[in-house]
Amino acid sequence: MKLKHLLPLTLATLLLGFGSAEAQTSKPKSQICRIGLEYQMSYNENWGANRPIILSIEPNSPAALAGLKVGDIVESINGRSLKDLSEQEFVEILQGGDAAIQLEVSNFSYKKKSRTLQPECHDRSLLDERLLAQAFAFYSLEDESERAIVYPFDTGREGKTSFENFGNFAFADESKALSSTDIALNEVIRKQLEAKGLRYDASDPDIVIDTYYTLARNPYFDAKKAKNADKLWDVRIDPDQKSLVQVPFLAVGADKQLADYVLTMGIRIFNGRNLSILLWSCEAVEHLTEEFSIEEYARLSIPMMMGQFPFVRYNINPKWRIATHRHNYTGLYLRTSDLGDVAYVVPNSPAAKAGIRANDVIVAINEKPMAMVDQLNAAYRLFVENTLQYRDESTMFTNRNGVKYCRYWRKDSYSSIQKQIAKEKYLSIFSYLFGFRPYILGERSTPYYTFDVLREGVTQRLNVMPELHDNSYITLD
């Protein structure tokens, strides 16, 4: 295996994005700004026709703090209707700098609701801990990676009806006694619809939900093939835990003769005023290598199926992204030219409370010495190369940024990994970003991290209590 195919976004690569602005634009920009949302222009009549739809919101980002939600339709920006703006003009306002942006957004439970979006900006020559965690991701891919998972769903919609004025929903055949499985499915769907802003009202529903499911033997199953197969499982997103779980499902596109069972589950949404009109549907056809609980499948899969209501992006085999971003936060901004140089400390942050100030020089963290950027980068690459034996081959994946052969740590090697990280030659000072993991710092007698800082010629040790920031989210890719 060639190391160049394995390496993550290294610090040197990351710093290229903070280089000379003059080389990138005719008007130099001294700041880089973060908003924390993704959007797509809608070109269907069901939801937000010819307006931007918010697709994802990064937790703890300016977009999240503004109260924006996935599925919001952007009606206006800084007082200008999106009907009068091109997409390019919309983007230029979003990327206009650090000035507050006024948005009006609509969803099921509100119309033209005002939201104030305040971009988070800092000098291009600085790095915060969120970006540092990306640069040093291979210390803990379990906490810093993005993966795409494809689902075997087929989604359809009626093309002309607007869903924007729907307010209430109910379930079909509510007068009949329901099985425990039916009740479980309805509960998952109800939770999803209520989170989108719809209300349950069996007396006057705008839409009516119907479900069906089967678990049957696969008539094309080839036991001999299955016995000789290398892999009879896949991973799926657990939407409750925002993590990946191993399941006895075949990956999309795998040989279906390896599956002993076929599970089919469907959701249909009908017009509550005319039940003959099917507005939206999604069907999952899953090939299983062993029996699996219908209720557990519903818990794992219905949130992903309902992720395309009301705005359909994929008709078949939708791709979901699980973005895992967890790191220790102290509130430091460091200079890209010298990562020991503290440029800014966020007020009331753990670092500020511990007494770290701007213009302090970090000498060491947890007794691991600081070094120059090129030294840190070389030592990090060496660490990645020399610890391949501790990676779990069964967890191999390609990160969303294109890095191949990514693998999580082997759980039976945590002690060995911790010993490697502790070696002086690896200059693993920034492993503190993932210090909440047992394979980083091992057993500790104190929750504090030690920061040795040089101030006015005197080195002093300060104890910092970091905060765990979890900015993980799930979105259609």
Question: Which ranges hold each PLM region?
Answer:
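Second-shell loop/turn segments in exported
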Residues: 59-60, 79, 170-180, 197-198, ...
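N-terminal segment of the mature soluble domain
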Residues: 168-227
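A structural "domain/chain start" motif
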Residues: 45-50, 66, 123-184, 337-338, ...
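PDZ-domain C-terminal substructure recognizer with occasional recognition of PDZ-binding tails
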Residues: 24-33, 89-133, 379-473
